[in-house]
């Protein structure tokens, strides 16, 4: 039997009961940046996004693209360089400042009037705006609607108990004709507490299926040596494309 196929077709766990009460605070996420525990950051960008970029963009120009829990994702620069307008939200000010520094972009910063303590960082070119605040506070900032959402490291990072609220916010930000690209991870949740959390396909359909057509574009075995420390022996990344029903 083909070993790769065996891994990629591994049976999904029916629910996330074992992880449902797991909670990380915003302060804990900020501490991850300070202590450099940011293994989720991909310096070369996301391979599956690169591969399916044309499917995601559909050859359209001047799109508004949203990055939830953006960190310092290099893909934000990719989209900006293609002429699109990028908006991200990230709780770590350190992560946002590192993005601009590492991409050699000058920027301005100002307070978010609607969110006490929040800040918005804007590239001097004007096509990248990063909000430093909780994603769950973001609706108060009236950031408008988006043509595209790239959700990698966001749904899998928020506390499982917050997923319904998260999905409602994401869908409220979509514009007619939107494309939403989601990357999730499949592993044995009884062996790793997360994050990243395990999000089964059934829950994805429950959260987004009433509004979206859901199509799995690809499954990839992404298991690496570092994952052994999680106590797991396989991890599959799945890429989904949501389109408007």
Curated annotation (Swiss-Prot):
Substrate binds at residue 40. The modification N6-acetyllysine is found at residue 58. Transmembrane segments: none annotated. It is found in: Cytoplasm. It catalyses: S-adenosyl-L-methionine + a thiopurine = S-adenosyl-L-homocysteine + a thiopurine S-methylether. Its EC number is 2.1.1.67. One of its GO terms (cellular component) is cytoplasm. Its main location: cytoplasm. SUPFAM superfamilies: S-adenosyl-L-methionine-dependent methyltransferases. Keywords: Acetylation, Cytoplasm, Methyltransferase, S-adenosyl-L-methionine, Transferase. The keyword Glycoprotein does not apply. One of its GO terms (biological process) is methylation. It is an enzyme of class 2 (transferase). Pfam families: TPMT. GO terms for molecular function: thiopurine S-methyltransferase activity. S-adenosyl-L-methionine binds at residues 29-40, 69, 90, 152. Belongs to the class I-like SAM-binding methyltransferase superfamily. TPMT family. HAMAP family: Thiopur_methtran. Monomer. This is Thiopurine S-methyltransferase. It comes from Lycaon pictus.
